[in-house]
Amino acid sequence: MKTFSAKPADVTHEWFVIDATDKVLGRVASEVALRLRGKHKAIYTPHVDTGDFIVIINAAQLRVTGAKALDKMYYRHSGYPGGITATNFRDMQAKHPGRALEKAVKGMLPKGPLGYAMIKKLKVYGGAEHPHTAQQPKVLDI
């Protein structure tokens, strides 16, 4: 019997919505990364994008455990000498709700063209409203 390999034309991408209110950052991110890759499906093939679209609402209410709200740091560099900037989780959530979740999920996905296509299927919104009601996303409870 031949090994099954999914074809991109045969894959159907479903839409799911996740309410992130009072959910822990890492637990949501790991489940989202798994579903973006498509590893929850029986037709999973590593070199084909078999994942689903994920819409996350209320990302501003995500939480972290312990003292990580102040201790967890995000770094970026301007490219100039001495141009490193550090931001903690609390400030990141206040300024850009959901960006911490996007960075966490992106770090869990493969690097390269396939991983870049997977991260485009993630839609994160800080509030309860999202513009994807036409896709009729199913509620996914984590």
Curated annotation (Swiss-Prot):
InterPro entries: Ribosomal_uL13, Ribosomal_uL13_bac-type, Ribosomal_uL13_sf. Pfam families: Ribosomal_L13. Transmembrane segments: none annotated. GO terms for biological process: negative regulation of translation; translation. It comes from the Bacteria. SUPFAM superfamilies: Ribosomal protein L13. GO terms for molecular function: mRNA binding; structural constituent of ribosome. One of its GO terms (cellular component) is cytosolic large ribosomal subunit. Keywords: Ribonucleoprotein, Ribosomal protein. The keyword Ribosomal protein applies. Part of the 50S ribosomal subunit. This protein is one of the early assembly proteins of the 50S ribosomal subunit, although it is not seen to bind rRNA by itself. It is important during the early stages of 50S assembly. Belongs to the universal ribosomal protein uL13 family. This is Large ribosomal subunit protein uL13. It comes from Polaromonas sp. (strain JS666 / ATCC BAA-500). The gene is rplM.
